[in-house]
Amino acid sequence: MFFAGPSVALTSPRAPPEPPPTLLAVAGSHRCAASGELTGGSFSQGVVLAAGVRGVVVDKELIDQLVEVAQRVVASGAISANGHGNVSLRVPGAHEMYFTAGPSLRNHAPSAVVRLGLDGTLLEGDLPPIQGAVVAMHTAMYEDHPDVGCVLHTHSPYATAYAVAHRPIGCWVEALAMFGLPTGVPVAEYGPRGSEQAVGNIRAATIPGVPAVLLANHGVLVFHRTPELAIQVGSIVEEAAQAGINAGSIGGPVEIPEELRVAAFQRAMVFESRGTAHA
């Protein structure tokens, strides 16, 4: 269960039912076939190519939604200059995901979407080994958090600076308290990309109810109920990191007192409950 936060003025996706749904991911410029046969065998770290999969029906609505999510991530600005990162979405009613398998979230297309089971099995599309290596941290978040509907990973510059310094982001920006990160953003210890050690470190660092974690020497991972909330939290984390670094030149950032973080969150909920005011 995540801390609730003020709603966003975007269309919410279908709520993921039980059992945990499938994931969607955009794959940069790689092909995603709508039919055909895939042969068995090992594919990459944590990913196994399904044997004999024919004519898999791909959910076009979810693929289009995932492409839009990737576009929104890029538009948010909370991303590195080269656009490196990946996004995934649960697929309602299936223990699977669609995943962005390309090297960049920029200039992607529906044909770049791949489909995987939450056990890491590749069901549809082409998944390069370097992207396949990060699948495990996406599936881990879905397995550990049944209410998560979207996982977002980027190398946004300021948040990554904290990750490289192995320093958590403190709750010195009010928006962190308002959107479910009153503890700030923790740091997961480094582990080689896609390894069991890396995934284990992420799980160990995750704070219950807090939908983000920094990945030491790597980047940032955000996981939330909806894509809209994941994008919003990703942007807030990057803004807080930038503010912290800028404040370092004038004495350093000052965290909000713990009791006032709770008050800031509760106040946000009061205004949320009132809805939009009209003159």
Regions found by a protein language model. Name each.
Residues 35, 39-41:
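N-terminal amphipathic/hydrophobic targeting modules at extreme N-termini
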Residues 2-3, 43:
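Aromatic (phenylalanine/tyrosine) cluster motif
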Residues 15-16, 40:
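Positively charged N-terminal leader segments that act as targeting/secretion signals
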Residues 17-21:
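Compositionally biased, intrinsically disordered low-complexity segments enriched in Pro/Arg/Gln/His
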Residues 10, 23-24, 38, 49:
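Leucine-biased recognition of intrinsically disordered, low-complexity hydrophobic segments
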Residues 50-279:
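Glycine-rich flexible loops
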